[in-house]
Amino acid sequence: MANTPSAQKAVRKVAARTQVNRARRSRVRTFMRKFDDALAGGDRASAEVAFKNFEPEIMRAVSKGVFHKNAAARKVSRLAKRLKALSV
């Protein structure tokens, strides 16, 4: 338990940031799930739209510190590879 007022405030701030970050991570996962569903359906047009929606969302999360930039780049690269394979 935090004893000093500054430590108590730090605990409150961490809890608030955790909620925001959890929401951002969930939003990114939702966009990723929409992309996966479009791929599973075999619809290239909707998969492209889902990918174009997913990429800026994950990069926005990177800029906010939710994901590491290399982890996000890896996810984007893998999804782009799957999208390209769908068209071949």
Swiss-Prot record:
Ribosomal protein is among the record's keywords: yes
One Gene Ontology molecular-function label: structural constituent of ribosome
UniProt superkingdom: Bacteria
One GO cellular component term noted in the UniProt record for this chain: small ribosomal subunit
Keywords: Ribonucleoprotein, Ribosomal protein, RNA-binding, rRNA-binding
Entry keyword annotation includes RNA-binding: yes
Record InterPro entries: Ribosomal_bS20, Ribosomal_bS20_sf
HAMAP family: Ribosomal_bS20 (MF_00500)
PANTHER family: 30S RIBOSOMAL PROTEIN S20, SMALL RIBOSOMAL SUBUNIT PROTEIN BS20C
Entry's family note: Belongs to the bacterial ribosomal protein bS20 family.
Name recorded for this polypeptide: Small ribosomal subunit protein bS20
Gene: rpsT
